[in-house]
């Protein structure tokens, strides 16, 4: 998993272009595409695109470990699988900057502590709101939960449609890509993987 996890440095505010520079870049792209950025329908587009991208790629400003920092120890002895499935997300392919639309299924085996359920969805959101590959995102989510919560094991499955395949190139609409990552007991004990997969199928 470590070979897949990519920890790219994030530019601080001193290294980032300004809002004005981002808007000018959009104008350049519009001209390159053959459009006139000054026409009525496009006058506000550079500003809108820059603001939208600030939200879409807001994951660069967040740290997953901070979100996962608060855990609960009062679990009444519960130590079996915790599964949160069908977590919807939108991301963007780092190769073509077009959308990836999918859902994540995440499980872990508690080791005396559990997460608030919203924290798992927030971690998915943090990594989805960056330029991504599905393989890297799968591994990043598992690593963040594994290292922060230190459970007995983590299982992550992501299924998604990549619009870089649907809109361009091979143009295969509806194709779904599945990726999985397992740590701890989910990796070393095949029976735990089977239980994870069975629970996913059982809730379909």
Swiss-Prot record:
Biological processes per GO annotation: one-carbon metabolic process; tetrahydrobiopterin biosynthetic process; tetrahydrofolate biosynthetic process
Keyword Hydrolase in record: yes
Tagged with keyword Amino-acid biosynthesis: no
Record's keyword terms, sorted: GTP-binding, Hydrolase, Metal-binding, Nucleotide-binding, One-carbon metabolism, Zinc
Catalytic activity annotation: GTP + H2O = 7,8-dihydroneopterin 3'-triphosphate + formate + H(+)
Binding site for Zn(2+): 93, 96, 164
GO CC term, one of those recorded: cytoplasm
Assembly notes: Toroid-shaped homodecamer, composed of two pentamers of five dimers.
HAMAP family documented for this protein: FolE
Name this polypeptide is given: GTP cyclohydrolase 1
